């Protein structure tokens, strides 16, 4: 069984037992999180599609860890004008383990 969920403005295809890095969620490590924005659920040949979300469908996850992605370096430059700007960014994430999918 698999589901397409929406969290942090992005969509992910998940199945039970899978680990997934999503945008940071304010929850403690080891806490159970319930995601209710389910776009689609499929099992074998049967597929349920929401408009836009499936009513009553949930995905239960456990927070495994919190962390930060690798640094992304931004460099802006104007040729011949002696203008250079350097900037870095590290995005926070939460790693989830998908426990159950209920449709």
From Swiss-Prot:
Q: Which HAMAP family match?
A: Ribosomal_bL21
- State the function annotated in the UniProt record: This protein binds to 23S rRNA in the presence of protein L20.
Point out the coiled-coil segments of this chain: none
**Domain of life of the organism encoding this protein:** Bacteria
Subunit description: Part of the 50S ribosomal subunit. Contacts protein L20.
The protein's matches in InterPro entries, at most eight in alphabetical order, are given as: bL21-like, bL21-like_sf, Ribosomal_bL21, Ribosomal_bL21_CS
Family per UniProt? Belongs to the bacterial ribosomal protein bL21 family.
What this protein is called in its record is Large ribosomal subunit protein bL21
Q: Does the keyword RNA-binding apply?
A: yes
Question: What GO terms describe the biological role, i.e. biological process, of this protein?
Answer: translation
User: Which taxonomic lineage is given here?
Assistant: Bacteria, Pseudomonadati, Pseudomonadota, Betaproteobacteria, Rhodocyclales
Identify the GO cellular component terms for this protein.
Answer: cytoplasm; ribonucleoprotein complex; ribosome
One MF annotation (Gene Ontology) recorded for this entry: rRNA binding
Q: Which SUPFAM superfamilies match?
A: L21p-like
Keywords, A to Z? Ribonucleoprotein, Ribosomal protein, RNA-binding, rRNA-binding
């Amino acid at each position: 069984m698999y589901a397409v969920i929406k969290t942090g403005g992005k969509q992910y295809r998940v199945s039970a037992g899978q680990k997934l890095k999503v945008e940071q969620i304010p929850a403690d490590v080891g806490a159970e999180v319930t995601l209710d924005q389910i776009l689609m659920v499929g099992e074998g040949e049967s597929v349920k599609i929401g408009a836009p979300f499936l009513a009553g469908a949930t995905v239960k996850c456990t927070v495994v860890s919190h962390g930060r992605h690798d640094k992304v370096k931004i460099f802006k430059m104007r040729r011949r004008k002696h203008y250079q700007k350097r900037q870095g960014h590290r995005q926070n994430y939460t790693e989830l383990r998908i426990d159950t999918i209920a449709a």
